[in-house]
Amino acid sequence: MQETLAHLRPRRLAVVTNKPYPPTMRILDGLHVTVYFPVVLGGESTAQRKPHPEPVLKAMALLEVAAGEAMIVGDSPHDITAGREAGLKTCGVTYGLTPRAAVEAARPDYLIATMRELLSLVA
């Protein structure tokens, strides 16, 4: 994960989760990846939570990124729906907590089995 994030570092990255902010930060800190994400939004960061696009749109605004320049990468149908509703390309991952079939059913634009595969999508 560190190697892939290091390659992506020149891009503006965010974490948008429905989890509360404090435990999200503990997870990111524990994985030693906080430095890669200048924007981290927890479930309480916006009035609406995913699958509503509001948290994704807020992250894009904070990063000053347009929808055409952005992609959401997620392991749940909520991620894919929120990204699509915000006008982003969507990438589902099959290595998360959600069963592959559920991620596929959300019909992401891309589907990857490893984080490293993401590099070929954003090259």
Label the model's feature ranges.
Residues 1-15, 21-25, 53:
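Short, acidic loop-to-helix structural element flanking the phosphoryl-transfer center
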Residues 2-9, 60, 80-85:
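Surface-exposed amphipathic alpha-helices with a cationic face
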Residues 33-48:
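A short, structured active-site edge motif that brings together acidic residues
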Residues 34-38, 66, 112:
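Conserved H-loop
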Residues 50-80:
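Conserved Lys-Pro-Asp/Glu-containing loop-to-beta segment of HAD-superfamily phosphomonoesterases
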Residues 71-110:
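Acidic, Mg2+-coordinating phosphoryl-transfer loop and its flanking beta/alpha structural elements
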